[in-house]
Amino acid sequence: MWSIKANGIYHFQLEWATNKQLFEPTNDWQTWRNKLVEALPGIGQAKVSFAIEMIHPTEAECICLDRHMLKAFGWTQLDKQPELDQYMIYEDYWLKLSAERGVPPVISRNIFWDRIQKQDSSLYWAQSIID
């Protein structure tokens, strides 16, 4: 496992140093995310989507479908990510629901996560750095 992560970090550094435009968002967030996943071996859709969420929380039109989100969609193989086409079906559904409610998809996903954690505010995770 460590060799996969080391290889992923190496390729990330290499791409960052030589191909900066790869890391610039495009108008199609999902296509951009998928290109990043292809260019960064060992880093899948969920991890890349999470990084995009952290950098562009109100603009991103892709979301991190981690095991908790997948479980909400009825995914039972929680130790395995779905294939890209299934990932995009779930993601497109979430994007549609968020758009219908006028809430950025990353924000709605974070609200959903807070509910799973039985938290009223997203600040609970930051308590260790606030104190």
Sequence positions of predicted segments:
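C-terminal accessory module of base-excision DNA glycosylases/AP lyases that mediates lesion recognition
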Residues: 11-131
